[in-house]
């Protein structure tokens, strides 16, 4: 768990800018990790932090928001994320085809 509640909340000067957003990343195992980032911060920062915390390679995880895969250069503002939104972290699977 992060120390999201310890930071002073700054007044939001409109949408975006320096405003922070609280996001939840939920793994396939049900484990939830909370992050507090600026709305203008690229999501790759959150993705790297999640992978480091879970000891997983960044290329082994697909991050999804509303069923769409996230790219590292996207920001919460671009995706119109709201405080408390959930990002799904899914392990890549290869194969899935059975021999005939």
Curated annotation (Swiss-Prot):
Put simply, this protein is called Small ubiquitin-related modifier 1
A single GO cellular-component term from the record reads: nucleus
Q: Where in the cell is it found?
A: Nucleus; Cytoplasm
Regarding protein family, the annotation reads: Belongs to the ubiquitin family. SUMO subfamily.
Role description:
Ubiquitin-like protein which can be covalently attached to target lysines as a monomer. Does not seem to be involved in protein degradation and may function as an antagonist of ubiquitin in the degradation process.
- Cited InterPro entries: Rad60/SUMO-like_dom (IPR022617), Ubiquitin-like_dom (IPR000626), Ubiquitin-like_domsf (IPR029071)
**Origin organism of this chain?**
Oryza sativa subsp. japonica (Rice)
Location of the region described as Disordered in the Swiss-Prot/TrEMBL record: 1-23
Subunit structure comment from the entry: Interacts with SAE2, SCE1 and SIZ1. Covalently attached to a number of proteins.
Please list the coiled coil stretches: none
Which residue stretches does the UniProt record annotate as biased composition, category Basic and acidic residues?
1-12
Decide whether keyword Ribosomal protein is in the record: no
Which UniProt key words apply to this protein? Cytoplasm, Isopeptide bond, Nucleus, Ubl conjugation pathway
Query: Which parts of the sequence belong to the Ubiquitin-like domain?
Result: 19-96
